[in-house]
Amino acid sequence: MNDLFNAAQHQLDALGLRCPEPVMMVRKSVRRMNDGETLLIIADDPATTRDIPSFCEFMDHTLIASQTESTPYQYLIKKGL
């Protein structure tokens, strides 16, 4: 799965940020991307384990992969479905 994360076209470092900042930054980053592009999010806020999947579902983006077993958490999302 590590190769999957390494293949992301964009990356967002949200380490040290707390809710709601990580999701606000994800939204801003995704807005600048084209449909189908991928974003790797690296975060350590436990709230992201709930917030990022919910954001993807609500905004119609695809959560391709996530690693939430240990920090830093990693999320790979694709803009659009």
Swiss-Prot record:
Signal peptide: none annotated. GO terms for biological process: tRNA wobble position uridine thiolation. Keywords: Cytoplasm. Coiled coil: none annotated. Pfam families: TusA (PF01206). It comes from the Bacteria. It is found in: Cytoplasm. Sulfur carrier protein which probably makes part of a sulfur-relay system. Belongs to the sulfur carrier protein TusA family. This is Sulfur carrier protein TusA. It comes from Shewanella pealeana (strain ATCC 700345 / ANG-SQ1).
